[in-house]
Amino acid sequence: MKALIRKAVIKDSISILNLIKELALFEKEPASVILTTSDIEKYGFGTHPMFQCLVAEVENKIIGMALFYERFSTWKGPTFHLEDLIVSKSYKGKGIGTQLYTAFIENSY
């Protein structure tokens, strides 16, 4: 299945949070998510973003994401850390994760 992989925009914040909650449910930790849509908007799309995010979209629905941020390696210099790569349960096994990971690599140092 081919998805549209694109950089997330502020209006995607609700979908991003829903995917995070879906992951937490899978990990049997649903109560651990204290992040809000406002937090995602502030820290991902505010004046000084702390993370970047790619989303996978199929038929105008966000069904996956790769959330990452810059860091510094004392051995390698600037790099990115992939915090989470999430694909909605009903779309797993369809190549969406591979498409997101490939796009992440292409957008990294």
Please annotate each region the language model reported.
Residues 4-18:
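A short beta-loop-alpha structural element at the N-terminal edge
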Residues 78-89:
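Conserved acetyl-CoA binding element of GNAT-fold acetyltransferases
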Residues 44-55:
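A short helix-loop-beta-strand connector motif used in the catalytic cores of GNAT acetyltransferases and
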Residues 20-43:
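Conserved GNAT-fold acetyl-CoA-binding loop/helix
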Residues 68-79:
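Conserved donor-binding loop and adjoining core beta-sheet/short helix segment
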Residues 87, 93-106:
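Conserved acetyl-CoA-binding loop-helix of GNAT-fold acetyltransferases
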Residues 55, 61-69:
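Conserved beta-strand in the GNAT
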